[in-house]
Amino acid sequence: MTDHRPSPEEEQTTANEERTVSNGRYLYCVVDTTSSESATLSTTGVDDNPVYVVEADGVGAVVHDCETVYETEDLEQVKRWLVTHQQVVDAASDAFGTPLPMRFDTVLEGGDASIERWLEDHYEGFRDELASFAGVWEYRINLLWDSAPFEETIADRDDRLRELRQRQQQSGAGKKFLLEKQSDQRLQELKRERRTELADQLKEAITPVVNDLTEQDTNTPLQDEHSSIEKEQIVRFAVLADEDDETALGDRLDTIVEHEGVEIRFTGPWPPYTFAPDIGK
């Protein structure tokens, strides 16, 4: 008996069949439709699908019709979908004010009627959350540090490190190795202290002008797009702030940038992705 293995085309067809949904609606966000004269949105979404609003008593879901969920191993395709998803949420923000953003690839079956029931089932929660986020936005703050200037001058300010380096220069090979190790340990200790100090200073500076703040994970060192200097991510914050406080927030970040070797990357305003509750699943 011949073992029939599916061709790539057959495998793709099978995968698509497994991901088919019945009268699906892809959700981008939930909005307060009372904040706009018209509960409509003129834009296209993922895969150029027309986007529209399904409304239930002043609360609307921004959706498009879909027949499959959006899953692929093609990372570039996923990135394109994510960018489009964000663009639709941005358009909804412009039209209706701060939305409650949904996760990428959130799909409900059952057509517009199921969306209306979903909105009605979670109506009180949606109304409360939309009211609480009205006029506030999420901002992302990333503190980067080039430690080279610090390493070049810290011995002038730290007696212990200066002593170790002086003894190292005056010692023989065996002793010199141990002193070099101690010197490096002291330098690393001082750098850890400086990282903590910078993060604390940033948090202290921005806290008075934000409504909420959460620390996010940092990755390994970033390469600056305009420089060969490798900068370390010290801390990343997501903050929730009133739109009127954006300038004040930026001014406070400027005081942190004055420190040598420090760079702040400040982005926003974003919908409250980090702070919006996972309601209405």
UniProtKB/Swiss-Prot annotation:
Disruption phenotype: A single deletion produces no gas vesicles. InterPro entries: Gas_vesic_GvpL, GvpL/GvpF. The keyword Cytoplasm applies. Its main location: other. One of its GO terms (biological process) is gas vesicle organization. Keywords: Cytoplasm, Gas vesicle, Plasmid. It is found in: Gas vesicle; Cytoplasm. It comes from the Archaea. It holds the Pfam family GvpL_GvpF. Induction: Probably part of a gvpF1-gvpG1-gvpH1-gvpI1-gvpJ1-gvpK1-gvpL1-gvpM1 operon, maximally expressed in early to mid log phase. Gas vesicles appear earlier when grown in static culture, possibly due to O(2)-limitation. GO terms for cellular component: cytoplasm; gas vesicle. Belongs to the gas vesicle GvpF/GvpL family. Encoded in a 14-gene plasmid locus called p-vac which produces predominantly short, spindle-shaped gas vesicles during all stages of growth. Proteins GvpF to GvpM might be involved in nucleating gas vesicle formation. A minor component of the gas vesicle. This the only minor gas vesicle protein that binds all the others (including GvpC1, GvpN1 and GvpO1, but not GvpA1), suggesting it might be able to assemble them. Gas vesicles are hollow, gas filled proteinaceous nanostructures found in several microbial planktonic microorganisms. They allow positioning of halobacteria at the optimal depth for growth in the poorly aerated, shallow brine pools of their habitat. Expression of a 9.5 kb p-vac DNA fragment containing 2 divergently transcribed regions (gvpD-gvpE-gvpF-gvpG-gvpH-gvpI-gvpJ-gvpK-gvpL-gvpM and gvpA-gvpC-gvpN-gvpO) allows H.volcanii to produce gas vesicles. A minimal gas vesicle can be made in H.volcanii by gvpA1-gvpO1 plus gvpF1-gvpG1-gvpJ1-gvpK1-gvpL1-gvpM1; lack of enough GvpJ1 prevents their formation. A similar region restores gas vesicle production in H.halobium without the p-vac locus, but it still has the c-vac locus. May form oligomers. GvpF to GvpM interact with each other in vitro, and may form multi-subunit complex(es). Interacts with GvpC1, GvpN1 and GvpO1. PANTHER family: PROTEIN GVPL 2. This is Gas vesicle protein L1. It comes from Halobacterium salinarum (strain ATCC 700922 / JCM 11081 / NRC-1). The gene is gvpL11.
